[in-house]
Structure formats: C-alpha cells, structure tokens
C-alpha cells in the first residue's frame, strides 16, 4: 500500500511540473500527409528519409498554448517547499553524504541527535520523516511517509 501511495503522490506532483511538449514526430508516406503536417507546424520541421517510400518528419510548434498546460506553479511550490524543509531540518543541521529532492543520507548518530533535539519528526504521517537503513549503516531520511495512509486516525472515530 505504501509504495502505491508514494507512486500516486509522485505521479501527481510530476504531472504538475511536466514540460509542455512543443514538437511532434510522425512517419509520412504521401504528399497529403506531408502537407497536413507541414501546415500544423509554423516554426519549421525536419525531414529524414527512412526508406524509399517513408519519411520521418519532426515539427516544432511556434506558439504553445500554455493556458491549457498543467498547474506548474503548484508543482514548483511543492518542489521548493520540500527543498526548504530539507535544508532547514537536515542540510543546515548536519553533514549530508548524498541527497535527492526529498531524501538525504546521514549518519545514524546524527539522526538520533536531530531527533532528540526535536528537529526531525520520525513517523508514519505525511510530512513526517521516514527512515531506511542501508547495508552499511547509513540512514536515508525521506520527507514523504505514506506507510499508514490506509489506517484510520484517532480523529476519524470521534
């Protein structure tokens, strides 16, 4: 369940910051297909011969309609908020040996220190940190923890 929830959250976030596709590639085999494709792309196109009867054409849109694109501002906010949270709570507090957008590799002793100081909250709720230990004793700390999303919370029973 946890991996499925993480996949759904990451997919939704990823779709929000997905780049608008500004070009298209097609195989064409006749003059009508070439004309139709060429009329659609006002910033030019590249034509490559695949065989004696088939060409590959790649066109670039001159003006992209961004009004129908994804809510990139929300995706960028999530990304920047995650970076700030990681900086404030981990990067500025301890030595980090490796990091990704939402995770960091730190020493176990440092994790315990940050936890005792109340800087890191380890748990199973969203926004709390998840900790995985690798084979050599390093800890991977991640911001998104979805382990118990399917478990009812105490306030659900009120």
From Swiss-Prot:
InterPro entries: DNA/RNA_pol_sf, DNA_pol_palm_dom_sf
Protein name: Uncharacterized protein 075R
Originating species: Invertebrate iridescent virus 3
């Amino acid at each position: 369940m946890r991996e499925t929830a993480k996949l759904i959250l990451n997919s939704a976030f990823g779709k929000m910051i997905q780049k608008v596709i500004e070009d298209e590639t097609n195989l064409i085999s006749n003059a009508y297909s070439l004309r139709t494709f060429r009329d659609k792309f006002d910033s030019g196109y590249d034509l490559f011969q695949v065989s004696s009867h088939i060409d590959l054409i790649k066109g670039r849109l001159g003006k992209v309609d961004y009004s129908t694109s994804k809510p990139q501002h929300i995706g960028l906010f999530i990304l920047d908020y995650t970076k700030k949270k990681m900086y404030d709570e981990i990067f500025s507090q301890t030595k980090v040996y490796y990091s990704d957008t939402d995770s960091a590799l730190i020493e176990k002793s440092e994790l315990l220190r940050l936890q005792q100081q109340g800087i890191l909250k380890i748990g199973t709720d969203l926004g709390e940190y998840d900790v995985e230990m690798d084979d050599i004793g390093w800890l991977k700390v991640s911001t998104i923890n979805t382990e118990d999303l399917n478990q009812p919370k105490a306030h659900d029973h009120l």
